[in-house]
A protein has these predicted regions:
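Short, structured segments at the rim of ligand-binding sites
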Residues: 1-298
Length: 298
C-alpha cells in the first residue's frame, strides 16, 4: 500500500477541504527521527532487527547506504527490517549520502568500527560555518583527525575518552557522539546533550547492545563503550510524538470523535498539558488518546 507521505511526495500541492468533524481511529507511525540513528547504529552490531519502522524515502535511503558499504538488509514485515553488517567494508560513503543530511550519523559508528570514515558533506554544504562543526569538533576531542576538501575524512589510530561540552545542543551531534563513544572502551561524558525522545531511544537501543549509559533524558550523558561488535538486538522504533501531537490538535480543532492509537505517553507530557489547558475533551488509555467534541467552547 502507498503511504500518505509517498502520495504527498508525488503532488505539487495539497488541497484540504476542511470544516467537517472527523470520526474513527488513526495509528501513529514510527518516528523517522528515531529510525535513522538506529539504522546508523546497526553498524556497531553484526545483526539488528528493527520494528515499527516507517516506510519512507529517508529510511530507504539510509538503508541503501548500508547496502552500498557491504551490509545487507531485508524487510521481513510491513514495518520490520533486519540489518546485517557483519561484512561491512571500510570505504567511502556513496555520493547519494550527499542528498541525505542524516547520513552524517554514519560518521560516528564508522569511525568507531574502522578508525576511518570518508563521506560527502551532507547537503553539499562546503562554505562558511557548517552545521557539522559540532560533530567534527567533538570527534577531534576524542582523538580523531580531520582532513577536508570535497569530502569529509576522519581518521583515528587511537580514540580516547573524555568530556565533551557541546557548542550547541544539537540532536544529531549528540547521537553521533553517543554512537562513536559506544565503540570506545573508555568513559565519555557529554555535557549540554540533547534529550529529545529519539536521543533517548538510541540510548535505550545501545544499552540493549551492552553499552553502559547513565543520564538518559538529561543534559549530561555518561557512556562506557565496549569492544565491537556489540551484542545483536531487536528494538522497536518509538511512535512519532510529533505526529501524535498533530492528530490530537487536529481532532480538537475539528471537534471530532477521534482515537489516536499507538502512542507513547512517556514523550507526550507537554502535549497533554496543553490539551488540558485548552479544555479539550480527551481521555487516555494504555496506548491511545480519545478526542471527543467539547461540551463547551474552547
Amino acid at each position: 500500500p502507498v503511504s500518505v507521505y509517498s502520495e504527498i511526495n508525488l503532488m505539487s500541492r495539497l488541497i484540504i477541504n476542511g470544516g467537517k468533524p472527523l470520526n474513527g481511529t488513526v495509528k501513529v507511525s514510527g518516528s523517522k527521527n528515531a529510525a535513522l540513528p538506529l539504522i546508523a547504529g546497526s553498524i556497531l552490531c553484526d545483526e539488528t532487527k528493527l520494528t515499527n519502522v516507517p516506510r519512507i524515502k529517508d529510511v530507504e535511503s539510509m538503508l541503501e547506504i548500508v547496502g552500498a558499504l557491504g551490509g545487507e538488509y531485508k524487510w521481513t514485515g510491513e514495518n520490520e527490517v533486519t540489518i546485517n553488517t557483519k561484512n561491512l567494508q571500510s570505504k567511502p560513503l556513496p555520493e547519494t549520502a550527499r542528498k541525505l543530511r542524516a547520513s552524517i550519523l554514519f560518521a560516528g559508528p564508522m569511525l568507531a568500527r574502522f578508525g576511518r570514515v570518508e563521506m560527502p558533506y551532507p547537503g553539499g554544504d562546503l562554505i562558511g560555518a557548517r552545521p557539522i562543526d559540532t560533530h567534527t569538533n567533538s570527534f577531534i576531542t576524542l582523538g580523531a583527525g580531520i582532513c577536508s576538501g570535497e569530502s569529509m575524512c576522519l581518521s583515528a589510530e587511537m580514540l580516547s575518552g573524555g568530556k565533551i561540552v557541546l557548542e550547541e545542543t544539537s540532536v544529531s551531534a549528540t547521537e553521533n557522539i553517543i554512537l562513536l563513544a559506544s565503540g570506545i572502551e573508555k568513559n565519555v561524558e557529554i555535557r549540554l546533550a540533547a534529550s529529545e525522545p529519539h536521543v533517548q531511544s538510541l540510548c535505550h537501543f545501545l544499552t540493549k547492545c551492552g553499552i553502559q549509559i547513565s543520564g538518559i533524558g538529561t543534559a549530561t550523558l555518561k557512556i562506557r563503550g565496549k569492544k565491537l561488535p556489540l551484542k545483536n538486538s531487536t528494538h522497536a522504533v518509538i511512535p512519532d510524538e510529533l505526529e501524535a501531537s498533530a492528530f490530537a490538535v487536529l481532532g480538537a480543532v475539528t471537534r471530532s470523535n477521534l482515537v489516536i492509537s499507538g502512542v507513547e505517553f512517556e514523550y507526550l507530557d507537554s502535549v497533554l498539558l496543553q490539551l488540558e489547558k485548552m479544555n479539550v475533551n480527551f481521555s487516555a488509555s494504555e496506548n491511545s488518546i480519545k478526542i471527543e467534541p467539547p461540551s463547551k467552547p474552547y
